[in-house]
């Protein structure tokens, strides 16, 4: 197992006691690997697509903890030999998740998936939780005994800037 995998596994074992921090970490997992999709019947679904077992595990733990979703309500679909899709199809749960992430309001007239809503990462502890979730979903780190390199890969430049700002907030030199 690589050093980066060991670090991710160690970080994923941590479960914040504060719900707001759990939500921030979940928001990072969704921001990095999640999406909203429509079923063939037109119903909304929340989905995380990843080959990362640690991120998959953390996503499920947070779903169960934050939203009290039973594991029997989670749909697992193998997309390829490596990728697994985790979907929530229950419309009440989907609505609850979207509202918690601030991706929609009570009317559901406008749904806007954003990397992270600023209200979710107002507190320092929530910023740390978000960074942890982003690292678990899309980060890597080299063994500091060899050389130091830490990165989190973002799909969009504005997401990378947002994450960079959070890292700089803690005086970490992010580029």
Per-region residue spans from a language model:
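Intein-associated homing endonuclease modules of the LAGLIDADG/DOD-type, together
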Residues: 1-60, 66, 114-166, 170
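A broadly used, surface-exposed interaction patch
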Residues: 56-126
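Compact structured core domains
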Residues: 173-175
């Amino acid at each position: 197992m690589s050093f980066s995998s060991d670090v991710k596994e160690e970080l994923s074992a941590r479960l914040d006691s504060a719900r707001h921090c759990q939500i921030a970490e979940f928001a990072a997992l969704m921001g990095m690997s999640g999406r909203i999709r429509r079923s063939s019947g037109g119903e909304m679904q929340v989905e995380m697509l990843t080959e990362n077992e640690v991120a998959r595990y953390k996503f499920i733990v947070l779903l169960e903890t934050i939203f009290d979703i039973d594991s029997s309500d989670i749909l697992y679909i193998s997309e390829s030999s490596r990728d697994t899709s985790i979907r929530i199809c229950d419309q009440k749960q989907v609505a609850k998740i979207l509202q918690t992430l601030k991706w929609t309001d009570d009317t559901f007239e406008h749904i806007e998936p954003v990397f992270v809503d600023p209200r979710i990462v107002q507190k320092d502890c929530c910023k740390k939780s978000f960074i942890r979730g982003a690292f678990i979903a899309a980060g890597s780190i080299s063994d500091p005994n060899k050389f130091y390199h830490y990165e989190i890969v973002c799909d969009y430049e504005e997401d990378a800037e947002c994450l960079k700002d959070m890292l700089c907030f803690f005086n970490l030199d992010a580029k």
